[in-house]
């Protein structure tokens, strides 16, 4: 019988390994993804993110370890677990000469979604992703942001419980990236989906429920964004209207900034204590919590 924690794990990976020649792409990887959360897989290119995704989706065989989706081993019941997953690949897999609707229709047919069932699902996705203005436009004539919306729609046709996004905003400008993230968050809430994100953008991981950081195929850190910031990032206090001699007397690391000084502190508690003990210096100040960057 599963305990309470196990029953909420929609993805369970234990001691996963994958080697390409002499390169250990995935090295004894173990982690959990909770149902309904935004899970972030963070790391630079070559860290092992895409390899793990390919194994999770059943596109690549593992050397050893286990991968379970909703308690089902994805190697023993590959087709069953594949229907639980929708994937947005880093490189779009849409057919550029075909229109948006033609792309979605041909993909839906692979899941047995045809006729009125397809038209109904298409309308639902139009309402969520708002691509009606270019439904009949060839994919090759879409902007990067528009194409990304269709990539997401394609992944959602069969109503998966897990949406995997492999570097979904790479190559997009900051404004378009934000638009895509607004769409993804809306999806997660309205469709009650689990979102598994791979990214090398720190600011995207900052919005996640849980973050796993990879380097050379191994986990080097994990936790909620709050836990990671408290563990690895220093907070700062910017103080104005004081002399450098007064700042030096505090015996903290600091640097000169415009109109003041920026002091490094380990956490909020330390900042509060410092301010209370030296109220005469902290008449004009700004406390900034460390960020994922």
Task: Please identify what each model-predicted range represents.
Residues 65-73, 80-81:
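Conserved ABC transporter NBD signature motif
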Residues 105, 109, 116-134:
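Conserved ABC ATPase "signature" region
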Residues 138-142:
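Conserved ABC ATPase signature
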Residues 159:
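Conserved catalytic motifs of ABC-family nucleotide-binding domains
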Residues 163-166:
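Catalytic Walker B motif of ABC-type/P-loop ATPase nucleotide-binding domains
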Residues 182-266:
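ABC transporter nucleotide-binding domain
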């Amino acid at each position: 019988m599963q305990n309470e924690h196990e029953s909420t794990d929609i993805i369970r990976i234990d001691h996963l390994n994958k080697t390409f020649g002499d390169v250990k792409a995935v090295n004894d990887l173990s982690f959990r993804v909770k149902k309904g959360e935004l899970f972030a897989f963070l790391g630079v290119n070559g860290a092992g993110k895409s390899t793990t995704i390919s194994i999770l989706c059943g596109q690549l065989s593992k050397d050893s370890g286990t991968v379970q989706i909703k308690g089902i081993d994805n190697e023993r019941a590959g087709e069953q677990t594949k229907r639980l997953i929708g994937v947005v690949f880093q490189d779009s897999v849409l057919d550029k000469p075909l229109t948006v609707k033609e792309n979605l229709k041909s993909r839906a047919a692979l899941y047995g979604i045809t006729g009125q069932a397809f038209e109904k699902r298409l309308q639902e996705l139009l309402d969520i992703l708002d691509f009606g203005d270019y439904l009949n436009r060839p994919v090759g004539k879409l902007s990067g942001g528009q194409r990304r919306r269709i990539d997401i729609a394609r992944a959602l046709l069969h109503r998966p419980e897990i949406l995997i996004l492999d570097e979904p905003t790479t190559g997009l400008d900051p404004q378009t990236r934000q638009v895509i993230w607004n769409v993804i968050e809306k999806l997660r809430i309205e469709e009650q989906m689990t979102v598994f994100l791979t990214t090398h953008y720190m600011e995207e991981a900052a919005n996640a429920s849980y973050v796993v950081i990879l380097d050379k195929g191994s986990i080097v850190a994990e936790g909620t964004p709050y836990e990671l910031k408290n563990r690895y990032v220093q907070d700062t206090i910017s103080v104005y209207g004081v002399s450098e001699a007064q700042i030096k007397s505090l015996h903290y690391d600091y640097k000169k900034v415009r109109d003041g000084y920026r002091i490094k502190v380990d956490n909020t508690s330390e900042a509060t204590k410092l301010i209370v003990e030296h109220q005469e210096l902290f008449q004009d100040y700004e406390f900034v919590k460390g960020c994922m960057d």
